[in-house]
Amino acid sequence: SGCRPVAGIFLMTGSNPVRLMAQGETSLAALREELNRIDNTLHDLIMERAAIAESVAASKGDAPVWRPAREAQILRRLIERHSGPFPRAALVAIWREIISAMVRLQGEFAIAVHVPEIDRNCRGLARDHFGGEAPMAFYGSARAVLTAVQDGSASVGVLPLPEDSEEAPWWTVLAGMSDNKVSVCARLPFAPSAPGNGEGAYCIAAIAPEESGSDNSLFALRTSPQVSRARLNDAIAAAGIKPGRLISRPARQDDVSVFLAELSGFAGPEDARIARLIDPDDGIAEAAVFLGVYATPFDAADISNRGGL
């Protein structure tokens, strides 16, 4: 007997190899046997990947086990090379489970999730991103999530996307945390199944920012009350950065305005373009506090079709 590649698979065809599939004569039993072989191969590769993940953990030492920029690069590469009828959304979901399981193999990994009174689906977004087996604790306040990440009791915190003019927004607390190594490092969902419906979350962690190749940066900008959104956007663009969303804190009597600025591209804490915004002579802002960098998520259109056809 022998085996013969047919339409990308190997079929056992007996003593005289023939293109049974082309002739429409492939038996269901033969196809099922081939699927079993593929399943075994996939399982072998997952076990091999897990062994490598353990070796990576040994090489990392005390380095953080979670690298969201690296995860984004993996998923982008897979979507780029994908073809055939298998749904892209399902491909991402499978790899998210695999990646998250591998992260947990490398060390302690706990997630703190903010679940406010008005549910904004942080719980569901966290489950979808980090997997059904990821250990999670749920908190009624954003400040508790920030504290859990800062003191190390949680590896990652999940907080709802800020909205304009929120009272006591969590991002101002993050900006005011002294000697802070915690920053935003991911945005959820990374692979939305439908166009944006307003639901979303940021992940925070005590890890150094890394470039993924397509990123967005977050800064808290303190300005005088006379600075309008339009003027601030113009100044950001003049500094060489493409502006994104501007979220404002409600006006107070301390004679300052504070904006959460979402900027296109990677900009770290010492970025020269940010320094232009706070230049004492002609800068528009009195201070700029780095809040984080996250890999740009997929658009729903990137993964909405059934496959790569």
Describe the role of every protein-language-model region.
Residues V6-A7:
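Acidic, Ala/Val/Gly-enriched low-complexity intrinsically disordered segments
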Residues F10-L309:
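Domain-level signature for soluble enzymes in the chorismate/prephenate branch of the shikimate pathway
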